[in-house]
């Protein structure tokens, strides 16, 4: 691959909470179209005929999100019919996978300008609506020793010795960092308010946040997944594989796990030549990407091998990275990643994450990549690494460099 892939723009919607949230009446297609419209406002001279493809991650591609929502967004937004559209699904990392795929297309020289991102309306299309062998088919569950992610998160905490106090302390940090970032205007460049067809404001902030969260309040919450474990026998399945563990300590609650929310994100990826032709200013370049599999029973340990792989591919070390952004699916996932790679607090999830602001499955990867582009610019820093744990036992990681 001889071409470089540059990030020219990275925007997102605010995240609306699932229950009685502000975005529950907004179609996921409308969230994406709104972002395309914003790109037009920011780049009025952009020749959209040069955009060869739109790649969107979406984890539950049924109902409002079915039928290739990326192509629907191209047509509904009035983009040229010559621009393609494809929806992809790598579970929680779908948004980052879309960006990585776009970068690979550009670096191959076969595409010059691609829009990538993701969308998930979890209030309109509940998680699991698309079915699937893993989780719903008893025979497959038996063959692959299926265990829900939440049980895997509690298993990580048990094996690593993370207490309830440890995961709650991390959750409190997430809320505090997110509140600080919002009050400091750190997201102002990338967050695009959602408006109705009359232009009236629907949502302009991440409404899942709880800035008034306290250590004492978190401690009062009951474990969220102990009942699921008992009902489905999932602890027993996990302990068949991890037989040296006597009992799983269920430490995760609604307060130290990622929030269920709605949202979308869009990133413009292109070659240097395309940017020059269109008068676009590159903000960062994609240095390297990597994907890794991991044990599907504990499931959520993939970020560590994916990170080691992408660092090796880029010829870099942990010390060469200024900022790390790991999706906060569950607090124990972040704590283990930090422990594995010896990452200092001041480099990790510096503006909070999904515990505070929510995890709109298909969009999150693109969202947190955009967060890192903004933060590198704000700090005048050089490199960031973005990674997510993934259902089925996988990890994806991407290194970007400010230009």
From Swiss-Prot:
<dbReference type="InterPro" id="IPR020615">
    <property type="entry name" value="Thiolase_acyl_enz_int_AS"/>
</dbReference>
<dbReference type="InterPro" id="IPR020617">
    <property type="entry name" value="Thiolase_C"/>
</dbReference>
<dbReference type="GO" id="GO:0009274">
    <property type="term" value="C:peptidoglycan-based cell wall"/>
</dbReference>
<dbReference type="Pfam" id="PF00108">
    <property type="entry name" value="Thiolase_N"/>
</dbReference>
<dbReference type="InterPro" id="IPR020616">
    <property type="entry name" value="Thiolase_N"/>
</dbReference>
<keyword id="KW-0012">Acyltransferase</keyword>
<comment type="similarity">
    <text>Belongs to the thiolase-like superfamily. Thiolase family.</text>
</comment>
<dbReference type="InterPro" id="IPR020610">
    <property type="entry name" value="Thiolase_AS"/>
</dbReference>
<keyword id="KW-0832">Ubl conjugation</keyword>
<dbReference type="GO" id="GO:0003985">
    <property type="term" value="F:acetyl-CoA C-acetyltransferase activity"/>
</dbReference>
<feature type="active site" description="Acyl-thioester intermediate">
    <location>
        <position position="92"/>
    </location>
</feature>
<dbReference type="Pfam" id="PF02803">
    <property type="entry name" value="Thiolase_C"/>
</dbReference>
<dbReference type="GO" id="GO:0005886">
    <property type="term" value="C:plasma membrane"/>
</dbReference>
<keyword id="KW-1017">Isopeptide bond</keyword>
<feature type="cross-link" description="Isoglutamyl lysine isopeptide (Lys-Gln) (interchain with Q-Cter in protein Pup)">
    <location>
        <position position="189"/>
    </location>
</feature>
<dbReference type="InterPro" id="IPR020613">
    <property type="entry name" value="Thiolase_CS"/>
</dbReference>
<feature type="active site" description="Proton acceptor">
    <location>
        <position position="359"/>
    </location>
</feature>
<dbReference type="InterPro" id="IPR016039">
    <property type="entry name" value="Thiolase-like"/>
</dbReference>
<protein>
    <recommendedName>
        <fullName>Putative acyltransferase Rv0859</fullName>
        <ecNumber>2.3.1.-</ecNumber>
    </recommendedName>
</protein>
<feature type="active site" description="Proton acceptor">
    <location>
        <position position="389"/>
    </location>
</feature>
<keyword id="KW-0808">Transferase</keyword>
<dbReference type="InterPro" id="IPR002155">
    <property type="entry name" value="Thiolase"/>
</dbReference>
């Amino acid at each position: 691959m001889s071409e470089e892939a540059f990030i020219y723009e990275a925007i997102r919607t605010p995240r609306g909470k699932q229950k009685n949230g502000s975005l529950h009446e907004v179609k996921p297609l409308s969230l994406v179209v709104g972002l395309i419209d914003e790109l037009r406002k920011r780049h009025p001279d952009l020749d959209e005929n040069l955009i060869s493809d739109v790649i969107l991650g979406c984890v539950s591609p049924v109902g409002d999100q079915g039928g290739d929502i990326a192509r629907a967004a191209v047509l509904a937004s009035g983009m040229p019919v010559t621009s393609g559209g494809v929806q992809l699904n790598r579970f929680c990392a779908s948004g980052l996978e879309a960006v990585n795929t776009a970068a690979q297309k550009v670096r191959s020289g076969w595409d010059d300008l691609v829009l990538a991102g993701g969308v998930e309306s979890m209030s309109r299309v509940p998680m699991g609506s698309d079915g699937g062998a893993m989780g719903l088919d008893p025979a497959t569950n038996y063959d692959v020793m299926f265990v829900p992610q939440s049980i895997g998160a509690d298993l990580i905490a048990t094996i690593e010795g993370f207490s309830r106090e440890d995961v709650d302390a991390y959750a409190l940090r997430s809320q505090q960092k997110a509140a600080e970032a919002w009050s400091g205007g750190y997201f102002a460049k990338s967050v695009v308010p959602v408006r109705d067809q009359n232009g009236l404001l629907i949502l302009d902030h991440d409404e899942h946040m709880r800035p008034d969260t306290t250590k004492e309040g978190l401690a009062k919450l009951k474990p969220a997944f102990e009942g699921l474990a008992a009902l489905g026998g999932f602890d027993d399945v996990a302990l068949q594989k991890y037989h040296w563990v006597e009992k799983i300590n269920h430490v995760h609650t609604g307060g130290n796990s990622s929030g269920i929310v709605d949202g979308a994100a869009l990133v413009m990826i292109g070659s240097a030549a395309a940017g020059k032709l269109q008068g676009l200013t590159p903000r960062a370049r994609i240095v390297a990407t990597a994907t890794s599999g991991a044990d599907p029973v504990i499931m959520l340990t993939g970020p560590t091998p994916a990170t080691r792989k992408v660092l090796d591919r880029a010829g870099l070390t942990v010390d060469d990275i200024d900022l790390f952004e790991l999706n906060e699916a569950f607090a124990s996932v972040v704590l283990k990643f930090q422990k594995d790679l010896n990452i200092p607090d001041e480099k990790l999830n510096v503006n909070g994450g999904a515990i505070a602001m929510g995890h709109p499955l298909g969009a999150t990867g693109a969202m947190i990549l955009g967060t890192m582009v903004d933060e590198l610019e704000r700090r005048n820093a050089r490199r960031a690494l973005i990674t997510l744990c993934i259902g089925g036992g996988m990890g994806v990681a991407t290194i970007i460099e400010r230009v």
